[in-house]
Protein backbone atom coordinates (compact mmCIF):
# COMPACT_ATOMS: atom_id res chain seq x y z
CA UNK A 1 0.00 0.00 0.00
CA UNK A 2 1.39 3.44 -0.83
CA UNK A 3 1.67 6.29 1.62
CA UNK A 4 -1.16 8.19 0.00
CA UNK A 5 -3.39 5.10 0.00
CA UNK A 6 -2.77 4.46 3.72
CA UNK A 7 -3.52 8.12 4.46
CA UNK A 8 -6.85 7.80 2.69
CA UNK A 9 -7.57 4.51 4.46
CA UNK A 10 -6.72 6.00 7.88
CA UNK A 11 -8.73 9.08 7.14
CA UNK A 12 -11.69 6.84 6.25
CA UNK A 13 -11.48 5.06 9.58
CA UNK A 14 -11.21 8.19 11.71
CA UNK A 15 -13.76 10.34 9.85
CA UNK A 16 -16.47 8.11 8.48
CA UNK A 17 -18.42 11.11 7.30
CA UNK A 18 -15.62 12.26 4.97
CA UNK A 19 -15.46 10.95 1.41
CA UNK A 20 -12.21 11.24 -0.48
CA UNK A 21 -13.10 12.13 -4.07
CA UNK A 22 -9.55 12.71 -5.29
CA UNK A 23 -7.26 9.89 -6.14
CA UNK A 24 -7.34 7.07 -8.65
CA UNK A 25 -9.30 4.47 -6.71
CA UNK A 26 -9.88 5.85 -3.25
CA UNK A 27 -13.60 6.46 -3.18
CA UNK A 28 -13.95 8.10 -6.57
CA UNK A 29 -17.49 7.70 -7.90
CA UNK A 30 -17.08 8.47 -11.56
CA UNK A 31 -18.83 7.05 -14.57
CA UNK A 32 -15.99 4.59 -14.96
CA UNK A 33 -17.22 2.89 -11.78
CA UNK A 34 -20.65 2.48 -13.34
CA UNK A 35 -19.48 1.45 -16.77
CA UNK A 36 -19.99 4.82 -18.47
CA UNK A 37 -16.41 5.09 -19.66
CA UNK A 38 -15.75 8.67 -18.52
CA UNK A 39 -13.81 8.92 -15.28
CA UNK A 40 -13.76 12.70 -15.05
CA UNK A 41 -17.46 13.37 -14.36
CA UNK A 42 -18.66 12.58 -10.85
CA UNK A 43 -22.02 11.51 -9.54
CA UNK A 44 -23.31 13.08 -6.34
CA UNK A 45 -23.51 10.94 -3.23
CA UNK A 46 -26.70 8.88 -3.22
CA UNK A 47 -27.26 9.12 -6.99
CA UNK A 48 -28.77 6.07 -8.67
CA UNK A 49 -28.92 5.38 -12.39
CA UNK A 50 -32.31 3.68 -12.17
CA UNK A 51 -35.52 5.46 -11.33
CA UNK A 52 -36.84 4.93 -7.81
CA UNK A 53 -40.62 4.35 -7.69
CA UNK A 54 -42.47 6.93 -5.65
CA UNK A 55 -44.82 5.06 -3.32
CA UNK A 56 -46.49 8.25 -2.09
CA UNK A 57 -47.85 8.92 -5.60
CA UNK A 58 -49.29 5.40 -5.78
CA UNK A 59 -50.86 5.83 -2.34
CA UNK A 60 -52.33 9.19 -3.38
CA UNK A 61 -53.77 7.65 -6.55
CA UNK A 62 -55.38 4.84 -4.54
CA UNK A 63 -56.92 7.35 -2.14
CA UNK A 64 -58.27 9.42 -5.05
CA UNK A 65 -59.80 6.31 -6.65
CA UNK A 66 -61.50 5.43 -3.35
CA UNK A 67 -62.80 8.98 -3.02
CA UNK A 68 -64.15 9.00 -6.58
CA UNK A 69 -65.86 5.64 -6.05
CA UNK A 70 -67.57 6.94 -2.91
CA UNK A 71 -68.69 10.04 -4.83
CA UNK A 72 -70.32 7.78 -7.42
CA UNK A 73 -71.95 5.61 -4.74
CA UNK A 74 -73.31 8.57 -2.76
CA UNK A 75 -74.60 10.43 -5.84
CA UNK A 76 -78.21 9.16 -5.62
CA UNK A 77 -78.38 9.94 -1.89
CA UNK A 78 -77.20 13.49 -2.56
CA UNK A 79 -80.12 14.00 -4.99
CA UNK A 80 -82.79 13.17 -2.40
CA UNK A 81 -82.90 16.62 -0.68
CA UNK A 82 -83.29 18.31 -4.07
CA UNK A 83 -86.04 15.86 -5.02
CA UNK A 84 -87.85 16.64 -1.75
CA UNK A 85 -87.68 20.36 -2.53
CA UNK A 86 -88.98 19.78 -6.07
CA UNK A 87 -91.81 17.63 -4.68
CA UNK A 88 -92.80 20.42 -2.30
CA UNK A 89 -92.67 23.11 -4.98
CA UNK A 90 -94.62 21.06 -7.54
CA UNK A 91 -97.68 20.67 -5.30
CA UNK A 92 -100.32 17.93 -5.36
CA UNK A 93 -102.51 19.10 -8.23
CA UNK A 94 -102.70 17.09 -11.41
CA UNK A 95 -101.30 19.33 -14.10
CA UNK A 96 -98.48 19.15 -16.62
CA UNK A 97 -95.66 20.52 -14.43
CA UNK A 98 -96.08 18.23 -11.37
CA UNK A 99 -96.70 15.24 -13.65
CA UNK A 100 -93.47 15.92 -15.54
CA UNK A 101 -91.58 16.28 -12.26
CA UNK A 102 -92.91 12.95 -11.00
CA UNK A 103 -92.03 11.25 -14.30
CA UNK A 104 -88.47 12.57 -14.15
CA UNK A 105 -88.14 11.63 -10.47
CA UNK A 106 -89.15 8.07 -11.34
CA UNK A 107 -87.22 7.81 -14.60
CA UNK A 108 -83.78 8.80 -13.27
CA UNK A 109 -83.52 6.02 -10.64
CA UNK A 110 -84.94 3.44 -13.07
CA UNK A 111 -82.37 4.47 -15.67
CA UNK A 112 -79.58 4.30 -13.07
CA UNK A 113 -80.70 0.84 -11.93
CA UNK A 114 -80.72 -0.40 -15.54
CA UNK A 115 -77.14 0.88 -16.02
CA UNK A 116 -75.88 -0.44 -12.69
CA UNK A 117 -73.44 -2.88 -14.34
CA UNK A 118 -71.66 -0.01 -16.10
CA UNK A 119 -71.44 1.83 -12.80
CA UNK A 120 -70.02 -1.24 -11.06
CA UNK A 121 -67.28 -1.43 -13.71
CA UNK A 122 -66.07 1.96 -12.50
CA UNK A 123 -66.21 0.70 -8.89
CA UNK A 124 -64.15 -2.47 -9.59
CA UNK A 125 -60.89 -0.78 -8.66
CA UNK A 126 -62.16 0.02 -5.18
CA UNK A 127 -61.49 -2.16 -2.16
CA UNK A 128 -64.99 -1.46 -0.77
CA UNK A 129 -66.93 -2.09 -3.97
CA UNK A 130 -69.64 -4.24 -2.33
CA UNK A 131 -70.51 -1.58 0.25
CA UNK A 132 -70.37 1.18 -2.36
CA UNK A 133 -72.63 -0.79 -4.69
CA UNK A 134 -75.10 -1.38 -1.86
CA UNK A 135 -75.16 2.33 -1.00
CA UNK A 136 -75.71 3.16 -4.69
CA UNK A 137 -78.59 0.66 -4.93
CA UNK A 138 -80.25 1.92 -1.72
CA UNK A 139 -79.97 5.54 -2.90
CA UNK A 140 -81.68 4.76 -6.20
CA UNK A 141 -84.42 2.73 -4.49
CA UNK A 142 -85.05 5.65 -2.12
CA UNK A 143 -85.39 7.99 -5.10
CA UNK A 144 -87.86 5.60 -6.70
CA UNK A 145 -89.82 5.36 -3.43
CA UNK A 146 -90.06 9.17 -3.32
CA UNK A 147 -91.52 9.19 -6.84
CA UNK A 148 -94.10 6.53 -5.89
CA UNK A 149 -95.02 8.50 -2.76
CA UNK A 150 -95.53 11.64 -4.84
CA UNK A 151 -97.74 9.70 -7.27
CA UNK A 152 -99.81 8.46 -4.33
CA UNK A 153 -100.14 11.96 -2.82
CA UNK A 154 -101.28 13.31 -6.20
CA UNK A 155 -103.89 10.55 -6.46
CA UNK A 156 -102.33 8.92 -9.51
CA UNK A 157 -102.10 5.45 -7.93
CA UNK A 158 -105.24 3.29 -7.84
CA UNK A 159 -105.57 2.82 -4.09
CA UNK A 160 -109.37 3.22 -3.60
CA UNK A 161 -112.18 0.83 -4.51
CA UNK A 162 -113.67 3.44 -6.83
CA UNK A 163 -110.51 3.29 -8.95
CA UNK A 164 -111.35 -0.28 -9.95
CA UNK A 165 -115.01 0.21 -11.00
CA UNK A 166 -114.17 -0.35 -14.65
CA UNK A 167 -113.15 -3.92 -13.87
CA UNK A 168 -116.24 -4.82 -11.79
CA UNK A 169 -119.13 -6.38 -13.71
CA UNK A 170 -122.49 -4.70 -13.24
CA UNK A 171 -124.90 -6.69 -11.05
CA UNK A 172 -127.50 -8.86 -12.84
CA UNK A 173 -131.13 -7.97 -12.37
CA UNK A 174 -133.10 -10.63 -10.67
CA UNK A 175 -136.48 -9.39 -11.92
CA UNK A 176 -137.90 -6.69 -14.09
CA UNK A 177 -140.97 -4.67 -13.17
CA UNK A 178 -142.97 -2.42 -15.43
CA UNK A 179 -145.51 -0.27 -13.66
CA UNK A 180 -147.86 -2.46 -11.70
CA UNK A 181 -147.71 -5.37 -14.10
CA UNK A 182 -145.63 -8.39 -13.80
CA UNK A 183 -143.76 -9.38 -16.87
UniProtKB/Swiss-Prot annotation:
Keyword Transmembrane helix: yes
Gene Ontology biological process terms from the UniProt entry: apoptotic process; protein insertion into ER membrane by stop-transfer membrane-anchor sequence; tail-anchored membrane protein insertion into ER membrane
Pfam families: EMC4
Domain of life, source organism: Eukaryota
Protein's cellular compartments: Endoplasmic reticulum membrane
Residues in the Cytoplasmic compartment per record: 2-66, 121-127
Membrane topology, as annotated: Multi-pass membrane protein
Entry's transmembrane regions: 67-87, 99-120, 128-148
List of residues that carry N-acetylthreonine: 2
PANTHER family: ER MEMBRANE PROTEIN COMPLEX SUBUNIT 4
Function: Part of the endoplasmic reticulum membrane protein complex (EMC) that enables the energy-independent insertion into endoplasmic reticulum membranes of newly synthesized membrane proteins. Preferentially accommodates proteins with transmembrane domains that are weakly hydrophobic or contain destabilizing features such as charged and aromatic residues. Involved in the cotranslational insertion of multi-pass membrane proteins in which stop-transfer membrane-anchor sequences become ER membrane spanning helices.
Description of how the protein assembles with itself and partners: Component of the ER membrane protein complex (EMC).
Protein name: ER membrane protein complex subunit 4
Organism (species): Bos taurus (Bovine)
Amino acid sequence: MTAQGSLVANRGRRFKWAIELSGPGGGSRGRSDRGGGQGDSLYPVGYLDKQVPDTSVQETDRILVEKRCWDIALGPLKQIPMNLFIMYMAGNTISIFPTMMVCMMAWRPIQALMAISATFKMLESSSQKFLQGLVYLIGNLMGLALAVYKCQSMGLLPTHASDWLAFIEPPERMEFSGGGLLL
